[in-house]
């Protein structure tokens, strides 16, 4: 564990994790209000909610270029400010084109932040990369929960509709940017001189890490997207709320557990393989039953996704040389979020082509196989 004297650094890492998701999850919490106000179609809603994930893939490598040119901390601050401004500007949208543009700006900011965090964790928590990653991943998960849980009572308290809600959830990101600028540890090199930024796409480990991480993100996003309509199709609409809550809150126990043990297990194959096996079994239970076991399986799938997510986020900083962490992280994010865009499309096509609702979960099951197949091939005894 980090020492008590490093608590402010730990707090900053946690807050940065919160900032990664706070503004993104503010949109689903008010999207119904936006739909009614701007008269959005279902396709337009799909595009505006999918834009951030697409930006995570498209802008990850350019984010590594910014890190190489400005340094890790400066690039991170740029990402925070762009995220806060873009998110707040969404509130001024009077039409779908403006909403697309401001959402793209916000997604670009987050896409810059994501590859900056692994090298920052390596700088700020030397020797405890697993713990540092678990800290900011826990913040990320909290950042996913807060807008969903508190937007409705917040809007009832302050009034102002969806526009006020988007502004309110942008303000903490701006505050976090100020705290990082004032309180971030100094005296460490932000980036090596003449730092390389373009990933080495011929490097096998990049593809292994990217596809393994892609399996995790795809399982999570695709299950969130298809579980409600699947339950509705089998006549269990009554379980939608409890199953989604179990899926998303199931990540939190894994994150808390890894705060204690991440440093000890991040370099071992078995956690990834075990989580893959349990995730695969959970998907099987989801499609094979129609009772309360669905909620339990959703919770276990969320636990596995949260656990592998935390460990996989640490791997670039654990396995790569310091000068390669940012560009490797960018490549991993580009590959993983590219998968997260494609797999839901494949799941939807499988359902449409077969007419069988369960078929949408076959690509999700294939994603669960990726940790099983790829983790044993990764050299976990790489650079410390």
Regions found by a protein language model. Give the residues of each.
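Cytoplasmic membrane-interface "Motif A"-like loop-to-helix N-cap segments
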Residues: 68-80, 263-276
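Cytoplasmic helix-loop-helix junction between adjacent transmembrane helices
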Residues: 102-139
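Helix-loop-helix hairpin linking two adjacent transmembrane segments in secondary transporters
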Residues: 127-131, 135-185
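Conserved MFS/SLC helix-loop-helix module at the cytosolic interface between two early adjacent transmembrane helices
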Residues: 58-94
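C-terminal transmembrane helical hairpin of 12-TM major facilitator-type secondary transporters
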Residues: 266-315
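Helix-to-loop junctions at the C-terminal end of transmembrane segments
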Residues: 59-71, 254-267, 351
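A late C-terminal transmembrane helix in Major Facilitator Superfamily
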Residues: 317-356, 364
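Extracytoplasmic gate region of multi-pass secondary transporters
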Residues: 27-28, 205-255, 259
